[in-house]
Amino acid sequence: MARMLAVRVVAGLAAAAVAALLLEHYGLAGPTTPLPKPRGSQRPHPAPGSEANNIFWGLQISDIHLSRFQDPGRALALEKFCSETIDIIQPALVLATGDLTDAKTKEHLGSRQHEVEWQTYQRILKKTRVMEKTKWLDIKGNHDAYNIPSLESIANYYRKYSAVRKDGAFHHIHSTPFGNYSFISVDATQRPGPKRPYNFFGILDEKQMEELVEFSKKSSQSNQTIWFGHFTTSTIMSPSPGIRTVMGSATAYLCGHLHTLGGLMPVLHTRHFTGTLELEVGDWKDNRRYRIFAFDHDLFSFADVTFDKWPVVLITNPKSLLYSCAKHEPLERLFHSTHIRVLAFSLSPITSVTVKIDGGDIGQASHLSGPIFILKWNPRNYSNGTHTIEVFVQDSAGRSRTAHHIFSAQEDAHLTFDPLASFILLTDHYIVARVLFVLIVLIQLTTLITFRYLAYPELKEPLGFANMTTFSLHILSKINISYYSVLLLTLYTVLGPWFVGEIIDGKLGCCFSFGIFVDGHFLQGGLTFINGIIQLVFFNIPLMAYVCWSLLHRCFGHSFRSHLHQGKYWKIIPVYLLILLLYIWQVYSCYFLHVTYGSLAFTFSPLRTWLTLLTPVLIYRVWTLNSTELGIFMVQLKSHLSS
């Protein structure tokens, strides 16, 4: 009866957890306001040709991380970018997509807003007069929102020192003689903004989503629309229908945040199911990367380049096949174009622009106007299959650069993005983290409860690894001190609170696996679930395994000292090395908590500080259990070994 009850409880918890996750992700919303549909086929003309019209270009820079403690070269390079680079490229607008400042403490673990970093940022903008040369659109990143109790707080230096100085999303329209182009910002920074690390994920609420839907509707009158934000869509938590659906009519979403995963993924680009491109740009902080993009006859092109590397080259026609989408762009204009078109910029005058297709030299492009170079061609000559265009640019100082990509003059041709990049950008990682967290907890609880109510084992087969593991789980689950300790630890990891402290300076809050309560606000969990998984996998479960292992040794009649002198050091030493490393990690997590959230959080942290202190107590208690408590298991082992 008890066994059936336990099974029903676990099954009910599993079903409830899965249902809750699905409902939260997909919602039970009724009919929603229709979103603008992607642009359909447009007129084939005007097509890219021999005139210097229907084209403009801009720049994107992200993750600048101006710091009062780290790498002053970031500020020096940014100043040069705002003067020299802007003067040469002369963009119509610049998108600065977040993390303008670093906002970390000297030891690089804690976080707070440093006014001097923001003053440095503003000084650069004013000194270079960059806002007089171009439209500088800067938005906040998660670092710019560290430790900010409210948007009205004096610590919200973005309002005082940025170029835009307006919190929240906005819709900028770039007007040209040949049409309007919409640039819609997404501000998913958390409100209020907790200290690091728990604001890694962005959050959009219902009101913010409604505002973005309105922007999307208004942008339907524009030639093309670009969305830009700090967070990748995979790190934004948003209610139904989801941020990707809302921006579904856009040509591209330009973002930063992931720093190309520390260089492991130098190209993080993909395409949404709506056809919208998602393009993460490399960080300025360590890699000095930026992006040049252009609309040439409403065809979108871009190139990610390294600061101070000249020439900068962008082929605008024919555009790259990988980044083409008939849903959003008039690709038929490419098929009716009369000229190959290239943008080339350098410190010195451009002297030659050589064009090759499929390895064959087809000629020298001639200078049209400004940075625009053109070369007559016939796209019908390349109407079959895919082809590679290569452009070699050289300036008068001998600097050179080659740009190349695959293109096609067929409407039905397409290429696929890197599957790993698509997984990183298209997966809602907070949903995956929640599901994994729940599954790990359910597996651990099911194992504990099942073995608790199973009949005592009978050892009939040889003592192999599987038999010993099963036997040790029986011991763990049927000895009260070990069973309730592990059960309580698992349940507490789920229910919390993990700690109570100053989530924001002067604002008390509680951190749970499912989110953070601070100053009357609830911030839903994203990174908290990931930390919960790490806690389970790298401490709770190994501790449970070690307790099982220790209890098994006790049943063989060993004490803590005697089991160390069995002579089987090759079996024992790896166990203790692993446990020691994991315990050191737990101790470090206490130190990290103290540095990031202060002494109060360190003191009132059951899952960190208290657990670190209680773990040796549990281990001592296990190794000093009376033989009477282990009696039936010791008898079974002796009986089996003597038979």
Curated annotation (Swiss-Prot):
Q: Which residues cross the membrane?
A: 9-29, 431-451, 484-504, 532-552, 572-592
Q: Which membrane topology term applies here?
A: Multi-pass membrane protein
Q: Where in the cell is it found?
A: Membrane
Classify the source by domain of life: Eukaryota
What does the UniProt keyword field contain?
Answer: Glycoprotein, Membrane, Transmembrane, Transmembrane helix
State which residues carry a glycan (glycosylated): N180
Molecular functions (GO terms): hydrolase activity
Main location class: membrane
Q: What is one cellular component GO term in this UniProt entry? A: membrane
Q: Which Pfam families match?
A: Ig_TMM62, Metallophos, TMEM62_C
State the protein's name. Transmembrane protein 62
Q: What is the protein's species of origin? A: Mus musculus
